[in-house]
Amino acid sequence: MPLYEGLGSGGEKTAVVIDLGEAFTKCGFAGETGPRCIIPSVIKRAGMPKPVRVVQYNINTEELYSYLKEFIHILYFRHLLVNPRDRRVVIIESVLCPSHFRETLTRVLFKYFEVPSVLLAPSHLMALLTLGINSAMVLDCGYRESLVLPIYEGIPVLNCWGALPLGGKALHKELETQLLEQCTVDTSVAKEQSLPSVMGSVPEGVLEDIKARTCFVSDLKRGLKIQAAKFNIDGNNERPSPPPNVDYPLDGEKILHILGSIRDSVVEILFEQDNEEQSVATLILDSLIQCPIDTRKQLAENLVVIGGTSMLPGFLHRLLAEIRYLVEKPKYKKALGTKTFRIHTPPAKANCVAWLGGAIFGALQDILGSRSVSKEYYNQTGRIPDWCSLNNPPLEMMFDVGKTQPPLMKRAFSTEK
């Protein structure tokens, strides 16, 4: 908490910024350079053998309400240690977040925690605030999927988005498959036992740790050779020499022998083109083709990559090499008028870029007040604005019912000179 708040400043208290990701949640205060905590988006329930994921889209409303209520209570009273009634809230969300989830989340915040206001901010748009630019092609490589969305002059171009189920979850599934098929374990009983005979499945936390500590992305030339050897039908393609094997401790009593070939081949699923010739790299190019032709050059020269999966060593270098390799193919060579692609380096780790953008936005008190949904409006209507809904109320009705609008709000929406 900033010092001036502790000295009894009469100004409005800084907002709480929450980036509720499917794997990890980032939480902190507006105006700060980093989140106060990064914790798994799970809760532990009595009688359940495994932790329960909080971000779920296919469960009923009351169950989701219960999960979110318990998780946000942990955020406020175990990590942030502040009164939720005193501070506005900025929620960083995906543009593809289902209405069912966001409505349940806002109901928890307004009805249970009684927060003064809530702002739902798109993660792709918030990422640009950290760079001070208005236009970019933003790729978010998260846990469930990779989602690309062009932003032009501060406006998301919603009809040009693209997504693929290629993210941390897909990497974990591939990693577990290869570990169970190829790896051995040393125990106190015997050496080099097959992994399935020791444990039927690998816990999610262990997969995450192995991925972060041992896996990396090969360069383009090596990656193409690995893919050719993997799909080798006639037996002519040889795999490049693998990196060193790694011994990974399990439970303090077992040693898992991870083959070097697994360390670099797991991540190739992000760049292997499927039956429809789609990969993480083609997502960007396909989205670029859908954009208006006069915006493509500017978007191609301003690529922004966020999300925890993109933090793998070598990911950005490989992504740029893949794009430059694919753009020479007939499918894209004629359609795209530019061959220049550049990736920005945001002033934060890739998994915290969207949170930092929300912290910057939340520190602008006048703008935050003019863009947030107030508690009074929500109590009157029970609704929140949704970009995919055609019957949203007028903008000026959503903010601080019965109160005068902030000066910036007046300037933005008034016709007076």
Curated annotation (Swiss-Prot):
Any one cellular-component term (Gene Ontology): dynactin complex
Entry keyword Cytoplasm: yes
Q: Which InterPro entries does the record associate with it?
A: Actin, ATPase_NBD
Q: What gene makes this protein?
A: ACTR10
Q: Which UniProt keywords apply?
A: Cytoplasm, Cytoskeleton
Q: How does it assemble?
A: Subunit of dynactin, a multiprotein complex part of a tripartite complex with dynein and a adapter, such as BICDL1, BICD2 or HOOK3. The dynactin complex is built around ACTR1A/ACTB filament and consists of an actin-related filament composed of a shoulder domain, a pointed end and a barbed end. Its length is defined by its flexible shoulder domain. The soulder is composed of 2 DCTN1 subunits, 4 DCTN2 and 2 DCTN3. The 4 DCNT2 (via N-terminus) bind the ACTR1A filament and act as molecular rulers to determine the length. The pointed end is important for binding dynein-dynactin cargo adapters.
What SMART domains does the record tag this protein with? ACTIN
Coarse class of the primary localization is cytoplasm
Name of the molecule in the record: Actin-related protein 10
- Which family does the record claim for this protein? Belongs to the actin family.
